[in-house]
Amino acid sequence: MLNIAALRQQQIPLAAEPRSPVPFHILMKPIGPACNLACRYCYYPQDETPVNKMDDARLEQFIRRYIAAQPAGAREINFVWQGGEPLLAGLSFYKKALALQARYAPDGVTISNSLQTNGTLINDAWCRLFREHGFIIGLSLEGNEALQDYHRPDKRGRSTWSAALRGIDLLHQHQVDFNLLVVVHNEMAAHAAAIYDRLVSLGARYLQFQPLMSEGAALREGYQLSADNWGRFMVGIWRQWRKRCDRGRVFVINIEQAWAQYFTHTSGSCVHSARCGSNLVMEPDGQLYACDHLINAEHRLGRLDEQTLAAAVDASVQLPFGQQKSLRRECQTCSVKMVCQGGCPAHLNAAGNNRLCGGYYRFFSDILAPLRPFSRDLNGLKAWRAAFVGTAAYCVAPYPDDIPL
């Protein structure tokens, strides 16, 4: 009689999982939309999506097949856990996941884990797990206490600022690497410098600013983000980061990724890649989708147990939303196309234009100013580093600070 458990322990595949010819990631939502907060702008509200927790059998199937389907030669495999609030899955869930990763990881391949949380449930036990296994934590936070408590209350409408800061303090105490993620909406546009200063005062070394997605609860609550306000806010962050000479101390992902993309011609973000579709999303029941912000029938790829992952990735990258994102007419002559690439398809309006286009143009135009004299290759990168990195030159370069925000 076939001993399934023994085969798994020996890493003998139950069925051949073909490798994907292209690199891909799957953002895993083990608890679906379940969350202990009631953010007013949530793009993934619980009342629109059934709440389930991934069972152990599907967790094992996902980890085994996700590892097996990576392209030949992959040296690192990253698992990304998100929600809702993924910590609601429980400590034991992630211990099982880590054990399965160790069981199925081939020799010489590094397994890494990233997790996005609101921070309010973090305790010492979680931090010990994160530290021991090298988790990279993303912590979602508003720019200050007043914004946090209004826009990100708990289920009873109560303040969450102190609980989130307690989570940040614990991450510091346990020396867990983390970044702070801020969702930007119109109300924040005039307060970029103050928000930046407050985040840095919390000891954050990595910051990421994400434009509001006009979907889910955000639509019902009337949240908006205009192109003007997106550009105004991000230029404000850029100016404050430069004014404080924080390069090397504070890593603003929006800036650093664009700078790297200018020289390397590749993006670390699907939003600013020439094509997208290789960052899939999986719900607790095994449903796969082509994009975290396009959870609908048009972008549904089927269930995990209905197909190979290579087939799902191939179907995803062939969808028009990812193939055509940087091919719109207005992008072809744009001076910042090399780092924008049309932005996220989820921000397209009814006319097929990116609602944030003008904001991206303003922000990228400003931050690319110090790079323009250098060639877009490794030699240019070396020359730019020699001229700017490790000096105060980028703090005082002739940028348009006299132009009002």
Curated annotation (Swiss-Prot):
The residues that hold [4Fe-4S] cluster 3 are C331, C334, C340, C357
Catalysed reaction, written as an equation: L-seryl-[sulfatase] + S-adenosyl-L-methionine = 3-oxo-L-alanyl-[sulfatase] + 5'-deoxyadenosine + L-methionine + H(+)
Q: Where in the cell is it found?
A: Cytoplasm
Return the broad EC class.
oxidoreductase
Q: Which UniProt keywords apply?
A: 4Fe-4S, Cytoplasm, Iron, Iron-sulfur, Metal-binding, Oxidoreductase, S-adenosyl-L-methionine
Pathway membership, UniProt: Protein modification; sulfatase oxidation
Where does the Radical SAM core domain lie? 18-249
| Family listed | Belongs to the radical SAM superfamily. Anaerobic sulfatase-maturating enzyme family.
Q: Identify this protein by name.
A: Serine-type anaerobic sulfatase-maturating enzyme
- Organism, by scientific name, is Klebsiella aerogenes
Q: What is this protein's gene name?
A: atsB
